[in-house]
Amino acid sequence: MICASEQSVTVLDSIYDEVKKEFAYRGCYFLKKGEELDKVRKTIIINGALNNKIPGKSAYEIAKLAGVEVPENTKILIGEVESVDISEEFAHEKLSPVLGMYRAKTFDEALEKAERLVADGGYGHTASLYVHPAETEKIAKHAEAMKTCRILINTPSSHGGIGDLYNFKLAPSLTLGCGSWGGNSVSENVGVKHLINIKTVAERRENMLWFRTPDKVYFKKGCMPVALDELGNVLHKKKAFIV
């Protein structure tokens, strides 16, 4: 699992059962609350950090490591949890086929939970939203709320985040910048352009200076009487600048 992989999913109450049914149909296993859930909790996160034995392992192998029996063809282990606090192991970045699943009464509540998960899981990376394309207000609201550099709409996070496969706005790359939010120097997918040394030759150029001159400039010795007469009687000027 790459860093852009889904780590948690938040589902609205109105479609929660339907989504859960679809997950099960697709080969996901919902951990039973109690012993099964706790066993996997203690396996995926140890002393507040990811257990280095689970990345690269299948859902079946992780369950076996935790002492939980699941079908061998299980694709994802899902833990239905409530807390988005860092004390909840399923709220962490897991880098494995293990998901935390949350439910929310409203879209705003779902956003709040997602914001917290991003805050503790790591600012700057990737957030996904599955919504009807016509609901542009929700898309805009989600994009504004998520402090991530990749905002994916109706796109698988793993494959969408690396660009090219499901969208053409992200450059194809397996090195994904997280911007200053994530302590990176770039906020986009790192590509060839970031590895090129570009020379810039800058010749001296100075900013243009200008000043506004009057319609007439009187000079030469003896011009003063004529100048003042013309300015006052012909041009009807009341002020003159004398250098």
Predicted regions and their residues:
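An N-terminal, well-structured beta->alpha segment
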Residues: 207-243
